[in-house]
Amino acid sequence: MVYCLKIIKKDGNVTNYYFSSYEELDYNATLCQFSTNIVKAIGLEVGLFKNKTLFEIG
């Protein structure tokens, strides 16, 4: 399973970071809560045919 952390910044930039475990995804999402530059962080479980949203921060 692959996990993706989609970061949406105040300047409109969207960046995707990929992780091999939910723990890594959760840890990095927690760090996002301390950033003043991030509007939203979305945790996704990435599948072959569709993605599942696990959480949204922001």
Please place each PLM-identified region on the residue numbering.
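Short aromatic-glycine-(Arg/Gly/Cys) micro-motifs in beta-strand/loop hairpins
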Residues: 1-14, 46
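Serine/proline-rich low-complexity intrinsically disordered segments, especially terminal tails, linkers
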Residues: 6, 23, 37-38
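A short, exposed loop/beta-hairpin motif centered on an aromatic-Gly-Thr core
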Residues: 12-23
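Short, surface-exposed linear segments at secondary-structure transitions and domain or protein termini
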Residues: 23-32
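Short, mixed-charge low-complexity intrinsically disordered segments
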Residues: 32-58
